[in-house]
Amino acid sequence: MSKPPPKPVKPGQVKVFRALYTFEPRTPDELYFEEGDIIYITDMSDTSWWKGTCKGRTGLIPSNYVAEQAESIDNPLHEAAKRGNLSWLRECLDNRVGVNGLDKAGSTALYWACHGGHKDIVEVLFTQPNVELNQQNKLGDTALHAAAWKGYADIVQLLLAKGARTDLRNNEKKLALDMATNAACASLLKKKQQGTDGARTLSNAEDYLDDEDSD
């Protein structure tokens, strides 16, 4: 029984596959790749020939070859982030794999980078202009919850400096501060929350004075 064909690429999305066999091109515009190579498919508009990139080279690949002789990688950026594989992560981003894509748990690649303590991965993801800091997964956890729970104070600090929210509660009504497993993370989160609350109090006081002045 043959595998069902992969779903077509939506605009702005990239399909990623791992080659199970080497493909030898017959014409100059076809793409050569070897067993185990990662292929990024960017155009499936032609049903017979798909446009793909592998190791920085772009070319055409027979669609039936990809469907039958390659393994689909559903969340390559997440896999790279989980493993702390920086070169693969950069390659995914270079090939326009979406930085804010969600896996089955509703988590982003940033969440998994924070969960695994991969500071270098977090820093690279932060270079993406539209990276979403505060995405909550199906458990309601954000990247900040993950970093606090795992005790990675350096990553908590990075997230806070980038503007991650400390007031988001997960499905168990817990803030990132409630999940902090060491004093360093708790201290950073407390300080940030006190600063936020202080700024809010000051803002409210200014609004009150403005109202008094307008009377």
Swiss-Prot record:
Modification type N-acetylserine: residues: 2
Positions of the UniProt region annotated as Disordered: 192-215
UniProt-annotated location(s): Cytoplasm
Keywords assigned by UniProt, alphabetized: Acetylation, ANK repeat, Cytoplasm, Phosphoprotein, Repeat, SH3 domain
Alphabetical list of SMART domains matching this protein: ANK, SH3
Sites bearing Phosphothreonine, chain numbering: 201
InterPro entries listed in its UniProt record: Ankyrin_rpt, Ankyrin_rpt-contain_sf, SH3-like_dom_sf, SH3_domain
ANK repeats, residue ranges: 72-101, 105-135, 139-168
Domain SH3, chain residue ranges per copy: 12-71
GO molecular function: SH3 domain binding
Residue numbers bearing the Phosphoserine modification: 203, 214
GO cellular component: cytoplasm
Domain of life (superkingdom): Eukaryota
Subunit architecture: Interacts with C-SRC and SMN1. Interacts with FASLG.
Function: Induces bone resorption, acting probably through a signaling cascade which results in the secretion of factor(s) enhancing osteoclast formation and activity.
Swiss-Prot/TrEMBL domain comment: The SH3 domain mediates interaction with SMN1.
Protein name in the entry: Osteoclast-stimulating factor 1
